[in-house]
Swiss-Prot record:
Name used for this protein in its record: Aspartate--tRNA ligase
A family per Pfam: GAD
Ligand binding (ATP): R226, D227, E228, Q235, E487, G539, L540, D541, R542
Recorded catalytic activity of this chain's protein: tRNA(Asp) + L-aspartate + ATP = L-aspartyl-tRNA(Asp) + AMP + diphosphate
Subunit note: Homodimer.
Gene3D superfamilies from the UniProt entry: Bira Bifunctional Protein, Domain 2, GAD-like domain, Nucleic acid-binding proteins
The protein's role, per its UniProt record: Catalyzes the attachment of L-aspartate to tRNA(Asp) in a two-step reaction: L-aspartate is first activated by ATP to form Asp-AMP and then transferred to the acceptor end of tRNA(Asp).
Region entry Aspartate, spans: 204-207
Organism: Clostridium botulinum (strain Loch Maree / Type A3)
GO BP of this protein: aspartyl-tRNA aminoacylation
Length: 593
């Protein structure tokens, strides 16, 4: 049975003692990292979230404490009182390596079984074990550093927004389901049988209502929920830094957030963010990088060869151009000697993105080698090489297809090759704003337009008339902040005119009745003088991944779910009592085979 503290107070953390503390009598508390018994002396490394310090117990120091210390094992939770002294053999690998604690008294606060995982940095254990014993995984120093980074990030964000006149305000977690986009998590109501709340995918509508309410600068750090198929770095619940401002335009939101990003990255990670951050229209991002989340740490931009081969009789090029598509290519330097098997793998790769194939031209010292050379005239080959600014050693990779297929396949191939060739500078942080997104996309299956972001996004002023004539060409006052090929956050200016908002719902295929059924409270609010407003939200978890230097989102969330949205620690979701279901008016239906 563990000993009680009985008024004993911790006076210093394990990672704090330095030479200026020599001679002080202190009490430390923490977990035993390891113990070494050298006969007349016992050394214990004691750990807490600030670091590790060495404690020495000896018969000459205190016989009772010495004998008691021999009983401790790894992960025992103990308290030790003694004097800080200069260490005879300093350990330069430890922050506290110049000193040690002479253990004069020890309390064993609780014992520990042998842990199923090692509590050390760089743990090599299965994800399932780490999640099942997450409370042990979180003791590891590298994990604790991550959550100190997370805490500091939130503090810097709060301080910055407070200094800039923002109010931290909460919005509801139990809200109304407005199915548009990802699936909602639904919560049955006991008071209203057969009816459900939804957990918010974002605070979007409520923060707009706060603007109508006159709270012109709002923010919160909040949980959001999406019941979607999980990819590698997605979680069913995630944290968002959310903000909204009134009486502003795009430039105001962007300028404020550039200053916020510069402050966060400098104060938390010592990273300088060059301001102003580059802005790139969506159209340019797709044409040059094949992605609305371009990684700018390396070149290999996409080039348009359509003009160069517009008169070609090569049926692959000709067919793509006649169908309204294009012929585009990327250039991989020093890859002309790439073997046929490697190129075949690249062809298989682009086919996963619906490309029909991958043409290639290898610019070698003594020849230009290509399986399509026989289908091209000398002038066409020369035009391609000139357009690509090709040099000896270059490998040109070409896709001819519909534009969306060309962009997606070459964009993915560009990233794939950059990783394979190891040409990405992992120490570089390249930010870019992507602007002028399409407002809408057409859903062929449903026969209607869908909002690319959400139905409250404002249109670019010069495109308003296109909403009646050609909705697919309308651009949005939307902006995403991208870092090293990952979306860090995104936002937009919102529609604040009730008639325009109703018109938008109509374009999206909502009847007036349906729009009022789902969003009536917002449309009603817009009758009462809504201000021009807009905002932005960051994925906090993804931001911490960059600041902490980890590629796994589960590392930055205290108790994450696994790839199947299951928690190995608590075993949630779980079967609930039939009485609970009955109280909610819910009956389980057994699935037929």
């Amino acid at each position: 049975m563990g000993e009680a503290l009985r008024g004993l107070k911790r006076t210093i953390m394990c990672g704090e003692p330095r030479e200026n503390n020599i001679g002080q009598k202190v009490t430390v508390m923490g977990w035993v990292q390891r113990k070494r018994n050298l006969g007349g002396l016992i050394f214990v490394d004691l750990r807490d979230r600030t670091g590790i310090m060495q404690i020495v117990f000896g018969e000459e120091i205190n016989k009772e404490a010495f004998e008691k210390s021999d009983n401790v094992k790894s992960e025992y939770c103990i308290a030790v009182t003694g004097e800080i002294v200069k260490r005879q053999s300093p350990n330069n690998d430890m922050e506290t390596g110049a000193v040690e604690l002479k253990g004069e008294d020890i309390k064993i606060l609780s014992e520990s079984e042998t842990p199923p995982i090692y509590i050390k940095e760089g743990l090599d254990a299965s994800e399932n074990i780490r999640l099942k014993y997450r409370y042990l995984d979180l003791r590891r120093p590298d994990m604790q550093k991550i959550f100190m980074i997370r805490h500091k990030t939130c503090k810097v964000v709060r301080d910055f927004l407070d200094e800039n006149g923002f109010l931290e305000m909460e919005t509801p977690i139990l809200t109304k389901s407005t199915p548009e986009g990802a699936r909602d998590y639904l919560v049955p109501s006991r008071n209203y049988k057969g009816m459900f709340y939804a957990l918010p995918q974002s605070p979007q509508i409520f923060k707009q209502l706060l603007m109508v309410s006159g709270y012109d600068k709002y923010f919160q750090i909040t949980k959001c929920f999406r019941d979607e198929d999980l990819r590698a770095n997605r979680q069913p619940e995630f944290t968002q830094i959310d903000m909204e401002l009134s009486f502003i335009e795009e430039d105001d939101v962007i300028e404020l957030n550039e200053r916020l990003l510069a402050k966060v990255f400098k104060e938390v990670a010592g990273i300088d963010v060059k301001l102003p951050i580059e802005r790139m229209p969506y159209k340019i991002a797709m044409e040059k990088y094949g992605s609305d989340k371009p990684d700018l740490r390396f070149g290999m931009e996409i080039n348009d060869l359509t003009e160069a081969v517009k008169n070609s009789e090569f049926k692959v090029f000709k067919g793509a151009i006649e169908a309204g598509g294009s012929v585009r290519a990327i250039k991989a330097g020093n890859c002309a000697t790439m073997g046929r098997k490697q190129i075949d793998k690249l062809q298989d790769f682009v086919k996963t993105y619906k490309a029909k194939g991958l043409a290639w031209i290898a610019y070698k010292e003594d020849e230009i080698k290509s399986p399509i050379a026989k289908f091209l005239t000398e002038e066409e080959m020369k035009a391609i090489l000139e357009k690509m600014d090709a040099k000896v050693g270059d490998l040109i990779l070409i896709v001819a297809d519909k534009n969306n297929v060309v962009f997606e396949s070459l964009g993915a191939l560009r990233l794939h090759l950059a990783k394979e060739l190891d040409i990405i500078n992992k120490d570089e942080f390249r930010f870019v704003w992507i602007t002028e997104f399409p407002l809408l996309s057409y859903n062929e299956e449903e026969g209607r337009y869908q909002a690319e972001h959400h139905p409250f996004t404002a249109l670019m002023d010069e495109d308003v008339e296109l909403l009646d004539t050609d909705p697919g060409k309308v651009r949005a006052k939307a902006y995403d902040i991208v870092l090293n090929g990952e979306e860090l956050g995104g936002g937009s200016i919102r529609i604040h005119d009730s008639k325009l908002q109703e018109k938008m719902f109509n374009v999206l295929g909502f009847t007036k009745e349906k729009a009022w059924e789902r969003f009536g409270f917002l449309l009603e609010a817009f009758k009462f003088g809504p201000p021009p407003h807009g905002g932005l939200a960051y994925g906090l978890d993804r931001m911490i991944m960059f600041l902490a230097g980890t590629e796994n989102i589960k590392d930055v969330i205290t108790f994450p779910k696994n790839q199947n949205a299951f928690c190995p620690l608590t075993e949630a979701p779980n079967v609930v009592d039939e009485n609970q279901l009955e109280e909610l008016g819910i009956k389980k239906i057994e699935k037929e085979d």
